Design a protein with these regions (language model features):
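Acetyl-CoA-dependent GNAT
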Residues: 2-3, 11-83, 89-104
Length: 107
């Protein structure tokens, strides 16, 4: 069994936008633009996380939109070379913990 890649899960900031926008282009056929990501970062009902590798590069990211007591995962993306390391699972676990702590009806 191979050793899993070490990542830190932190809130996404403006400093991560270029790497996240690049990740969008790599992973999705209709990616969110950098401007769309900026707008979502400013949305009080949205939360975005990034998984940073040991060199503080974005290995993955995920987004959550909360409407009333409902949580909606907007996007989950992991760099192709970083996949199969449990990164998406770690990102989603933070959102699951948030949903439970804030008594969301569903996620």
């Amino acid at each position: 069994m191979r050793e899993q890649m070490h990542v830190r899960i932190v809130p996404m900031t403006g400093d991560h936008l270029d790497e996240v926008a690049e990740l969008e282009r790599i992973c999705f056929t209709t990616p969110w633009s950098r401007n769309m990501l900026v707008e979502e970062l400013q949305n009080d009902c949205a939360a975005f996380l990034v998984a940073l590798d040991d060199e503080d590069h974005v290995a993955g990211y995920a987004g959550l939109l909360v409407v009333l007591d409902e949580g909606y995962i907007t996007n989950v993306a992991v760099r192709p070379e970083c996949r199969r390391n449990g990164i998406a699972q770690k990102l989603l676990q933070v959102f699951l913990d948030f949903a439970q702590a804030h008594h969301l009806a569903f996620l």
